From Swiss-Prot:
GO terms for biological process: nucleotide metabolic process. The keyword Hydrolase applies. It comes from Hahella chejuensis (strain KCTC 2396). This is 7-methyl-GTP pyrophosphatase. SUPFAM superfamilies: ITPase-like. Its cofactor is a divalent metal cation.
Amino acid sequence: MTNKSPHPSIILGSTSPYRAALLQKLNLNFQQAAPYFDEQITPTSLAPRDIAINFAKEKAESLREQFPDHLIIGSDQTAALNGLLLRKPGDKATAIKQLAACSGESVTFYSGLALINTRLNTTRTCVDWQTVYFRDLSREEIERYIELEKPYDCVGSFKVEGLGISLFEKIEGKDPNTLIGLPLIELITLLKKEGLRIP
């Protein structure tokens, strides 16, 4: 008979070094795994906040069979400008166009979380948000920023963990980690419900 640990091991369903750095703040042992999920398939009938939750859950679910005795964390981020979904730009021209649209506007970012306990077959989900108020950006500022950071794989066309902060006038929300894609305050709540002691 084997003795199981009181809590399953933790899997972060993301290869992002930024999300990993955030999770390390909680002083937990974990490993990263790439989810099997195509983000290009976006249900247009859902609101941006619901897409973030659904994608987070699907990312975690995609790792269920690979990690049958674990706590799997899935996360996803969406953004909305005037109610319209913003996607990852993918290239320079689209990034410039996206930031130009955001100039002087407010954009709400939603970070969905899913925590699957594959030992107990339970799933917990939540979403957190941040509203970013962009400064009035000149074409020169936008092009210079895009050239420096090349944020082509980032929702909103900026990297808040880098020079992207220079584009903002202010940020509203309860957890600054949400903009990087892993809302730690909400995650701590989910992990505590699984019996983990933090701190």
